[in-house]
């Protein structure tokens, strides 16, 4: 499998969305940029903010689409074309309702699972053959409560758990960058004792 060259965090732009559950993908790439000393800059031709990060001997592009979540694919596909990156070399970090806070999971391929940023990306690519980092935000219990849930802020305990999941995913990332996704998944998916 190809090594990763582009890591995208999904979220909604603007300070009013900064700490919402829906911005778990932004939270991941922001933490990654902070840990590696990468600096964000606006890139209008890619419809987002970009940074170049050096991680475990690999140079990787980071992207935060400045479009709203539902239009994330526009930014992602523009970046893939501009940097001549194959979808298989892409990792998209996003919030995941079906995982509890404190849980993060890597996966390759599949559908959008109702996540609108993934939906738009899959629509524009014509397939779902790319890597995902699913950051658990929990589910409110009923589908009618999903929109206010994802657009709301997590409580203190859930927020800390989401932060721990982000840190664990960053710790597993060097294995994925080496193209060793099975080992990265094993490290991330195995409960700590």
Curated annotation (Swiss-Prot):
TRNA binds at residues 17, 68, 70, 116. GO terms for cellular component: cytoplasm. It is found in: Cytoplasm. Its main location: cytoplasm. The record marks 12 as: Discriminates between blocked and unblocked aminoacyl-tRNA. InterPro entries: Pept_tRNA_hydro, Pept_tRNA_hydro_CS, Pept_tRNA_hydro_sf. Its EC number is 3.1.1.29. GO terms for biological process: protein quality control for misfolded or incompletely synthesized proteins; rescue of stalled ribosome. PROSITE patterns: PEPT_TRNA_HYDROL_1. Coiled coil: none annotated. One of its GO terms (molecular function) is tRNA binding. It catalyses: an N-acyl-L-alpha-aminoacyl-tRNA + H2O = an N-acyl-L-amino acid + a tRNA + H(+). The active site is at 22 (proton acceptor). Keywords: Cytoplasm, Hydrolase, RNA-binding, tRNA-binding. Signal peptide: none annotated. HAMAP family: Pept_tRNA_hydro_bact (MF_00083). Belongs to the PTH family. Monomer. This is Peptidyl-tRNA hydrolase. It comes from Xanthomonas campestris pv. campestris (strain 8004). The gene is pth.
């Amino acid at each position: 499998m190809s090594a990763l060259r582009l890591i995208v965090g999904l979220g909604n732009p603007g300070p009013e969305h900064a700490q919402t559950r829906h911005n778990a993908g932004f939270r991941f790439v922001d933490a990654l940029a902070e840990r590696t000393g990468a600096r964000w800059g606006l890139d209008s031709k890619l419809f987002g903010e970009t940074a170049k990060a050096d991680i475990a001997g690999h140079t990787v592009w980071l992207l935060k689409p400045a479009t709203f979540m539902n239009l994330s694919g526009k930014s992602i596909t523009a970046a893939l074309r501009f940097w001549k990156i194959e979808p298989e070399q892409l990792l998209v970090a996003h919030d995941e309702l079906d995982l509890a806070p404190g849980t993060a999971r890597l996966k390759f391929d599949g559908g959008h699972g109702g996540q609108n940023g993934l939906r738009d990306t899959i629509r524009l690519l014509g397939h779902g053959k790319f890597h995902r980092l699913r950051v658990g935000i929990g589910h409110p219990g009923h589908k009618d409560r999903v929109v206010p849930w994802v657009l709301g802020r997590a409580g203190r305990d859930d927020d800390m758990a989401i932060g721990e999941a982000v840190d664990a995913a960053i710790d597993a990332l060097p294995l994925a960058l080496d193209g060793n996704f099975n080992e990265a998944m094993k490290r991330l998916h195995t409960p700590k004792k």
